[in-house]
């Protein structure tokens, strides 16, 4: 009966169950729709209960089969689409319109090839004909004469060119031509320097030097003149008296201040006509300024010549542009106090050194640089009680940058160019008899504008 029951579908392990003495609670077949069955050992030692259902939930194999069927169906649709596309392409390939277009293209291509070959052949025939004609002409008397005439003309032209070249060399060696050439070069150089404002690209001195160091090499070659106190009528004095007298003059003289205010506007103009007019007015002033009246500038220059007969205004301005200004200005923007102290009078040095000393006390570093120095000019002169003072104006392009100990920008802008207009008062040091080291900075003033380009 147990075997029959097993064959009925409700137990699949008859040997194991019967051998272990498991008692079947029911001999009825388990329903297919879902129920529960129990298996118990005699004595109630083991009871196993299992519930199952065969609802709408699909098994793993059933889902896998469904996916395979869907993929096959999609592959079948794709194959049908590819087949239809190939059929359409084949119909297009075999269409009359496409066949006709191909025939026309082949016809045009063959015609083009034949035309090119015909043109090439005609050009070859024409070239041969022209060559034969030229050979015949060259063999005739007329052709020989034409050829000889061309050769003669070429020889004549060559001889003429050689004659002109030799004549130019002879002209270039004449004294008159040399004088004219030198004059033209001088005028050109003068115009360039006056209009453009400088003679070359600015270069920082290899080493900032003091006045005595700068004059050392020239001192051996130059004659030093002693001061004639009887002719001058003055006695050597200290820096403080010089500076105090200059300050009184500068602060109380309205004409002086108005003059420099107008000159700043005039010199700062970038208009080409104004720059050209500056050059013209400067030259006319130099030539005619001292002919009709005894100006204060002439008195100052005369007084300087009494002490230094070799003094020349143009040479002095060149010295300012290439030596005096670069050394002092580089020392100012880089914080070189020793250089400043040697070039400046005491009051001016104290004024400049104060801000530098404060910056160094904070550990700040100077990274400024000078790009250009131009338009160096002798604006005016002033006779002080102790000696002559020359006021020099010039323009400088600077990049002002100060960094903290971490290397960060503390003040200034490394990408901003400043155009500075300086007014310097230079005094001849009465205690220094060497003319190349006699000038010191008595006072300084400046105005700045941002350079756009």
From Swiss-Prot:
Cellular compartments per GO CC: mitochondrial inner membrane; mitochondrial matrix; TIM23 mitochondrial import inner membrane translocase complex
Keyword annotations for this protein?
A: ATP-binding, Membrane, Mitochondrion, Mitochondrion inner membrane, Nucleotide-binding, Phosphoprotein, Protein transport, Transit peptide, Translocation, Transport
Topology within the bilayer: Peripheral membrane protein
Binding site residues for ATP: 167-174
Q: Which cysteines are joined by disulfide bonds?
A: none
Q: Extract one GO molecular function annotation from the record.
A: protein-folding chaperone binding
Where Phosphoserine occurs along the chain?
A: 181
Q: How does it assemble?
A: Probable component of the PAM complex at least composed of a mitochondrial HSP70 protein, GRPEL1 or GRPEL2, TIMM44, TIMM16/PAM16 and TIMM14/DNAJC19. The complex interacts with the TIMM23 component of the TIM23 complex. Interacts with SLC25A4/ANT1 and SLC25A5/ANT2; leading to inhibit the presequence translocase TIMM23, thereby promoting stabilization of PINK1.
Please report which protein family the annotation says this sequence is part of: Belongs to the Tim44 family.
The entry's protein name is Mitochondrial import inner membrane translocase subunit TIM44
